[in-house]
Amino acid sequence: VYTIVDGEISLSCLNDKYISKESEKTSKLCAFVITPSKYYEQYVCEIDGKIKVLLRAIGAQNGVANFQFIANEGGIKAFEMGYRVNGNDDFKVIRKYNEIDFSKMLVSYSLTGKMGDTLVKDNPCFPQYSATLCLYLHGGVIGKIDYSGLVGKKGIDDISMKRCVGNRIVENGTNGQKAGMIKFSAESIEEITSIIKDIKKNLTIEDLEGNNMLLTMFDEKRLLQEEGING
């Protein structure tokens, strides 16, 4: 995610994104996001400058731009760009650590023609790991949503439910099956995986008959494996 103020372009956040393995229930939707990215140094060295050149070339002066990449042994390759706010609510994480809120800046720009803040404090190297767990549902009508066991818990930063009791979910393999997102932070990858387990224990979404509606959530073992940690 890049924030742009009066022609100054700043890298605000770099995430690693894990795709859902529920291939029969959804398309390739995002299951889990974590920042800082393990590819941060490689990205800054190889890609960041080129992205800034691109944004300057299109005349970007004020706003927010987001890019998606695939990183593997062949390097880092871009496949999608948006000159807009992305869907992961990254402004909440950036605001927490850097006191910069690009959502408010965009509102300010739409009303006054000025972003209303500077990028002096912008820094994508956050002091903690910050993660987002995405929640998807089977088809049906929601009869119960309970996450009370997570409210106020250490590490839980934000619970954003996009669905409520009575909503009908159509099983069509799109973001229409998304129930919401839970953001959390910790000092280590091991702590992040522990919070994922706790979320699974303390979150309930059922249909009118009391059946579980949650699709299988992100497997924390994938994160440990990617980070080379024995779990």
Annotate each language-model stretch with its function.
Residues L11-C13, E80, D158, M181:
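Extracellular/lumenal ectodomain signal focusing on beta-strand-rich modules
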Residues G75-K77:
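Conserved protein kinase catalytic/activation segment
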Residues Y2-A60, V64, A71, G82-S110, ...:
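ATP-dependent carboxylate/phosphate-activation module, predominantly the ATP-grasp catalytic core
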Residues C13-D16, E80, L137, R163:
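Pocket-edge structural micro-motifs
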Residues V1-Y2, G143:
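PAS-family sensory/regulatory modules and their coupling/dimerization elements
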Residues V107-G231:
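Peripheral (often C-terminal) accessory segments that flank ATP-dependent C-N-forming ligase machineries
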Residues Y2, Q61-E73, T118, L214-D219:
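A short glycine-rich, hydrophobically flanked beta-strand micro-motif that places a catalytic Asp/Glu
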Residues F69, E80-Y83, L137, A186:
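Active-site proximal loops enriched in glycine and acidic residues that flank catalytic Cys/His/Asp
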